[in-house]
Amino acid sequence: MPTPRPRSTPRWDEAAHTPGLYDTTRRADYGKRFLYTVIRLSLAAFAGLCVYASYEPNGLWLAAPLGIALLIIALQPWGDKSPAPGAWLGALIAFTQGLITYLFYLPWIGEYVGSLPWIALSIVEALYSLAFGAGTVFLLRAGRAARKREPRVSPARSQKGCSNAARDSSTSKKGSSSEDRLSGRGRVRVHRTITANEFLFTVIGIPTWYLAVEFARSHWPFGGFAWTRLAWGQVSGPLLSLARIGGPALITVATVTMGVGIAIIFRRIWIPGLVITLVIPIVAGLAWSQVDAGPNPSTERIDSFAKSNDVASSNNGADNGAEAHESGPQAQSIQMMSKESGITYYRASDSSSPENLVTVAVVQGNVPRLGLDFNDQQRAVLANHRDATLALARRIENHKSPKPDFVVWPENSSDVDPFLDPLARDEIQQAAEAAGVPILVGTLTHPGDQERNTVVVWDPETGPGERHDKVYLQPFGEYMPWRGFFRHFSSYVDMAGNFSPGDDNGVVHVRSGKTNALIPVGVGTCYEVAFDGAFQHAVEGGAQIFTVPTNNATFGFTDMSYQQLAMSRLRSVEYDRATVVAATSGVSAIIRPDGRVSERTQIFTEGILHAQLPLRSTRTIASYSATIIEWTLCGLGVVVALGAAISQRKPQRVKSK
């Protein structure tokens, strides 16, 4: 007869007949559960901080897989001391992780409208994590179900195993590839590997289920909020190359899969965990050999300092250059001081063949004041960009700067409709004629009774031409859904715009100011860069270079501009296109097709960027199949999660007559 397992707690009938014993045991049980719940929630909060650390400007890409791993560990059973949490607790754990991430990631929302919108949006975004947490609990249970079925052992082996408990225990601590456990039935050898169930429900199920939840968050309601996608935190790591295959969706799945691998390592299943964790970044890193960044630029920076700041400005200019200038080993940096204006010039030139290259100039005119009220000085903003362009024209005339093919102004660089205001029209025309090349102007237009956020091509000879009306509008900013309802919570709803979306593919054709050739430019205005459809439609429409005109002045010195820049970098890699970011107050940037930033400005400064960039008509795998890959992975995640939940339904008891 096998030796019965000693009971650590009294039987229910013993507790029932012992005064106070049952209550004491129950209170101890509740205390232990509460303690482990607090530990799990604390671990989830730290996981949220790790995920936040992966986003720009922090750029700690490896922190995201670590954060996902900590979240999965918080949802796992911790031996006999703390069994796996239920679905409700799992949902709360994931909600905690999401809330901490978004509270740290989105404070720019409330920069000038108060903390209520920031906190409310963070809570709404974290609500989607409830589904991920509950689903992951079911997936983990289904994955570990096979491990609960232990093999039978003979009584003789059982007694032998019990009599040699100390020896077996010491043997199991020597790092072998298997684990010897003692149970009431004897010694059981548990191999350090993962079962087919675990591979399906954990390695495949958890990453794809995460993507499915992220997909819902990015599309619903009001068009979704794609700003919080996990992939945006991977632009500084090797996983970025996966964008050319499956876009942000594949990067998200790869990131979560690495987190699953780290969680498996935590369970001391070494080899499978290491393989899952390392194979993805290694393969992605090797894929960079297939990524063509285009010609290597040699860079020149020329700083022009304000008249009233001779010494102080020159010191600041040197510091600014150190931060703004990013170049490869072949780059050279040349600094010159001039007192002709307060504009900082950055130029990236190329000495290779001019074939399929285009020269672009970006004007960052800055805004007269920080905050929402800068729109009250609409003409001052327009004047800033006109004056900066006139300064550029003088440099071109004096052969200090190369003549560009076209110039890009930011979103809202003219908050006055030039089609209705003759003075605004004259100022833009003056700038275009002085530069002698077309300008992409971000402005407001009013077709019919609508108001639209527009980027229009302004030719020095023919005036306004093709235009892109912003398709993906920012809810609660550019338009206000349910305005009457939300007015009960904040009076700031009346500050939201009333824009109407456009319906074009985002491609405008710009006549080169040097060759007269038409250049197809894909435009993604500000918020649009976060959405897959914006540049996807532009590439399908023949865009050979991207531009992202944006207005971030409302968000001050927060991380918003750097977060948006990360999205532009990922889009460059995804579609193999150079991207020009033009911001009213920064950060403006030149992005190579490999996602590398060759030049950028600082926030709330005046500056001009020059760059010679490649035009490309080839298409990546992602441009054909990213949508199909995303839908397939999302569908797989939903099916596997539902299968895990259904497989654990408790059988109904049949009442005996």
Locate the predicted segments by residue.
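Short, conserved active-site loops that position catalytic residues or coordinate cofactors/metal ions
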Residues: 57-72, 101-104, 364-365, 401-416, ...
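Active-site catalytic loop in hydrolytic enzyme cores
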Residues: 109-116, 143, 182, 218-246, ...
